[in-house]
Each structure stands twice: as structure tokens, then as C-alpha cells.
Amino acid sequence: MSSDPMRNIRNFSIIAHVDHGKSTLADRIIQLCGGLEAREMEAQVLDSNPIERERGITIKAQSVSLLYKAQDGQNYHLNLIDTPGHVDFSYEVSRSLAACEGALLVVDASQGVEAQSVANCYTAVEQGLEVVPILNKIDLPTADTERAKAEIEAVIGIDASEAVAVSAKTGLYVEQVLEAIVQRIPAPQPRDTEKLQALIIDSWFDNYLGVVSLVRVMQGEITPGAKLLVMSTGRSHPVDAVGVFTPKRKTLAKLTAGEVGWVTASIKDVHGAPVGDTLTLANDPAPKPLPGFQEVQPRVFAGLFPVDAEDYPDLREALEKLRLNDAALRFEPENSEAMGFGFRCGFLGMLHMEIVQERLEREYDLNLITTAPTVIYEVLKTDGTLVAMDNPAKMPPINQINEIREPIIRSNILTPPEYVGAVITLCEEKRGSQIGITYLGNQVQVAYELPMAEVVLDFFDKLKSVTRGYASLDYHFLRFQEGPFVRVDTLINGDRVDALSVIVHRHQAERRGRELCEKMKDLIPRQMFDVAIQAAIGSQIISRSTVKAMRKNVLAKCYGGDISRKKKLLEKQKEGKKRMKQIGRVEIPQEAFLAVLQIDNK
């Protein structure tokens, strides 16, 4: 390499909407640079988690260091940091981008620009990254590179005249991408301080090594034996080993400025290396941490309970291990009258929640019940205190509430023009208020303010169905807004089931209560006694349905004879049912808890 060790380093990310071929392009780049031999290559090398492969999405940021001999004859050190594309994982993207000097914006030439690419691209531009547009899937008959270029310029506003057109699947023109990386993405710049500063891009737990952190060294160097200080926690740890992924784990003597690699430092506590934090030397610390570290705020909350109460300690341990990989996952113990001990968990969105539940069940072999997800509400009490409420069961009594505020988000929806009407209708049904509509070439951008509670459940699915799958959605939190909200409780035989309580808009309360009762009637198995299902607001019952009892025909052995004999047997049966109803408990199946989700918010 040249005299300046950082001159030939290129740190870059790949940003794209879900399904535009980001992971496939990463595979081709690894193959071309000889990161893996042909026999070791497999599809989606960087998506190491089986759920990522099955769903075809990237959840966690991954990195790989490659050597590339460019056409100018020099050897370049390329560090690729893969990023997720789904709206739920936008913080993962911003951290990955903070570790780079450039980004490849991958756009499917047959589909054009979609909302998530726009959001991630704006993040990259705000952080001062050089964005190189890549048009992928040019081998498809429906690919239209000129239209895709025009959309990139119209929607995102960056110059696409030198966009590189490739087919990641076949490997066509991928070498031009590598040349564009070398020529257009700047080398890392030395910082004004000589002291060590390293950004933690990701952390995960390894049973043998403890916590492994993926870091970008901004300044200084990390060597085994040095004492590292984690700036947000104030704790220091001795470094065991450092290295890079090629994508196999490779140990090095040191990590120097500009490089991206892994560090192990015997950190056993899963909260010891928060993602987005800064590492520095304990005996010669940097004056201030790197900018941009923020605590991620969960937006969707749900209860997770083990089906078997004995699994509670295992669930706690599994959640603690998952939280290390997942900076956004929050949980606290919760006790439900209906389901015993479990945890109240906070997630970024519905996809995040599904993935966490799937990982718990798969990787830790747990059998779980999930309650219906809710968003966080603000409650202003009559004594002037403001409380955050993430669980409807914790809502204060009505006479203590001054007002309830719900979270409002701003959503940007990109859709083909023919579906604009359907999108507007859907947003209006969800109590949205329109901000504006912008026509951008072959796409229309519809901006709405929507209540988050309406979006988290099934908005995305409905948006896809009314636009035949063409629309894409990106959203961010705006503010809390007051509204007329009530809690609808579900009573089973007069007992309130706290896990089935929901907070709804007053105008929808009666319909939601009625639909919930009907749904529960189909899902609760018949007992030996009548089961009354009621929906109530406070003490006022707004709906009721009954699961009829199974009964034995006690008159089967009476042939003719006196009517009083039959009456006596029927009375005896009635008494037994009454007694049974007093002591009998109704087992509520998992499907009943998810019924709250399935009620169509028409």
C-alpha cells in the first residue's frame, strides 16, 4: 500500500428497499474479490440468520473486508457493511452508515425507486456520504434503466447520469461497481484527535468469546492487551483479540484507523457494549464520544408469556441474550392474572416483533403466547402528572384521567398513479389527515399524518393489497395528540381478562367490542357450563355473546313414566352446572389473544 495507510481503504454500505437485490450484489462483490472460494459460496452469504434467509430480508448489519486489485494496478482494502432495508430496522441502517464514507444505492431497474430507499438515502446524504446509484436486475425483460435513472433524480434528487447498470444475479458488469467504489467513494479522513475512537456498529453474544463487537476505528489503533473504555457505561475491559471478517473470522495483530473489524474484550455482561457507543483507551481517553449515539425508542409493545410457567427463567435468559444483538428490544417482567408471569416487551414495529418471537421459539426452543400489540399512550392525570402507558391494563381509573394522547406518525407512501384513490381511502379509514400529494415521474408520493395505533396492526398488509403490492411505506414519529379514547375490557364469566384489554377510539368502541365478542365465541372451546363473553367500558357492558354448554342427555334412560322424575333429573343437572360454573376455570387458547389483532379495523 502507499505511504498513507488510509488512502487505499474504502468503507461503504449498500442501501436498498427490501427485495431489490442488495444481498445478491454483496455475494457477487465477495466472489469477485475472492473472499470465499467457489465451493464455499452460497446465496446471501451475509444473511447468516436462518430467519433472514427464509424471509429473504436482512435484519442485522454484517461486515466483510475484501482486497481488490483495481485497474490502476493498486491494491485496495474494501470494507462492505451490509444494512437492513425494512422500515423497522432504520436505526441499524443509520449506525452502519455512520461507519462509512460512501453508499451504493441499489434500485431495481424493473420497479424503480421505493419508499425505503428514499428514507435510507436521505440518511446517507445527511451524514455526508457519497452515494453511488446502482441499477440492478437489468437482465429482466421489464427492466427500464432510463426510467429508473429519471426516478432517482426526481424522487431522491441525486445525479444518476453515471449510475452503474448491473445484474447481480448473473454477475454482469459487477466489476464496474468495484471500480466506481474505488474512484468515487472517498478514503477515510484522519480526525483532529490522535486518541483512539472506535464506533460500535453491532454486538452479539458468543458462548465462548463473550461479547463480540463489530467496530469502525475512526482514529488510533486497537491492539490485543490494551484496556478499552466503553464511553457510555464508563467501564473498561482488556482486549483479547481483534480481526476482520473475510467473511470468515480472521485474527489480526491490530486494527488501525479507517478499518472495520471485530473486537473481543471478555465482556460477559450483555449490556457492556451498547450498539452505537464509542470505544477509547482507558489510560488515554478521547475527549468526547463520536456523535450520533442515541437510545432507540420502541414503538410497539406486547406481552410474551411462556405456555409452561416453568419456562419463565429460560425466557428471561433468552431475552437477555437477544437484547445484546438487538439494541432496540426492551423488556420488563409482567404479571398477568390470566397468564401468570411473563415479560412486557417493546419493539420497533410488527416485523421486529414477529422476528423476535420466531427467534425465541426457534433458537431457544420456547413455547410462547403473545398478547395483542399496543402502542405507547400518554395519560395526563387530573393531578397534573403525565404518565406513559404501554399496557392497557395499567390505565388509571377514568375519574383520574384528564386527557389521553396517542402517538401520531408522518407516513410517506410511494405508489403508481392508478392506486392513489385506493391509498387515500385507506388512509382516511385509518383516521389519517392528508399533508400533500406529489407527482414524481411514474410514481406518486402521498404524505399523511396517521395514528400509530392504526398503522402497527395491519396497515402495511392492507396497503399492499389495495395497490396490488406496488406501494411502499416509510414513516417516522411526529408527536402525541389528544383524542377521545376508552379502554374496552373483555370479561369471561364476569372476570376481566387483562391481556385482552384494548384502547380504542370512542367512535369505534362499540363495533370493536361486538366483533371481539363474536370472534371469541368461535375460539373459546365449549365447556360443561355456559361461558358468558362480554365487552365493557368501565362498568357499562356494550356487547355480549355466550358459548353454550355441552350437556349430557340425562333423560335418555327414562322411558315414559312420571314427568316429576324427569324434572328432578333436570334440576339435579342444573344444580351441578351452577356449582361447576362457580368453581370452573375457562382455558383461553392462544388464538383468542390474537383475535384482537384479527378484528378488521374497517
UniProtKB/Swiss-Prot annotation:
Catalytic reaction equation(s): GTP + H2O = GDP + phosphate + H(+)
Protein topology in the membrane: Peripheral membrane protein
Pfam families, per the entry: EFG_C (PF00679), GTP_EFTU (PF00009), GTP_EFTU_D2 (PF03144), LepA_C (PF06421)
GO CC entries: plasma membrane
UniProt entry tagged with the keyword Disulfide bond: no
Record EC number: 3.6.5.n1
Gene Ontology molecular-function annotations: GTP binding; GTPase activity; guanosine tetraphosphate binding; ribosome binding; translation elongation factor activity
A biological process from GO: positive regulation of translation
Subcellular location: Cell inner membrane
Keywords associated with the record: Cell inner membrane, Cell membrane, GTP-binding, Hydrolase, Membrane, Nucleotide-binding, Protein biosynthesis
Main location, first listed in the record: membrane
CDD domains linked: EF4_II (cd03699), EF4_III (cd16260), LepA (cd01890), lepA_C (cd03709)
Top-level taxon of the source organism: Bacteria
Boundaries of every tr-type G domain copy: 7-189
SUPFAM superfamilies given in the database record: EF-G C-terminal domain-like, P-loop containing nucleoside triphosphate hydrolases, Translation proteins
UniProt: GTP binding residues: 19-24, 136-139
Family: Belongs to the TRAFAC class translation factor GTPase superfamily. Classic translation factor GTPase family. LepA subfamily.
PANTHER family registered for this protein in UniProt: TRANSLATION FACTOR GUF1 HOMOLOG, CHLOROPLASTIC (PTHR43512:SF4), TRANSLATION FACTOR GUF1-RELATED (PTHR43512)
Record function comment: Required for accurate and efficient protein synthesis under certain stress conditions. May act as a fidelity factor of the translation reaction, by catalyzing a one-codon backward translocation of tRNAs on improperly translocated ribosomes. Back-translocation proceeds from a post-translocation (POST) complex to a pre-translocation (PRE) complex, thus giving elongation factor G a second chance to translocate the tRNAs correctly. Binds to ribosomes in a GTP-dependent manner.
NCBIfam families hit by this protein: lepA, small_GTP
Name of this protein: Elongation factor 4
Source organism (scientific name): Xylella fastidiosa (strain 9a5c)
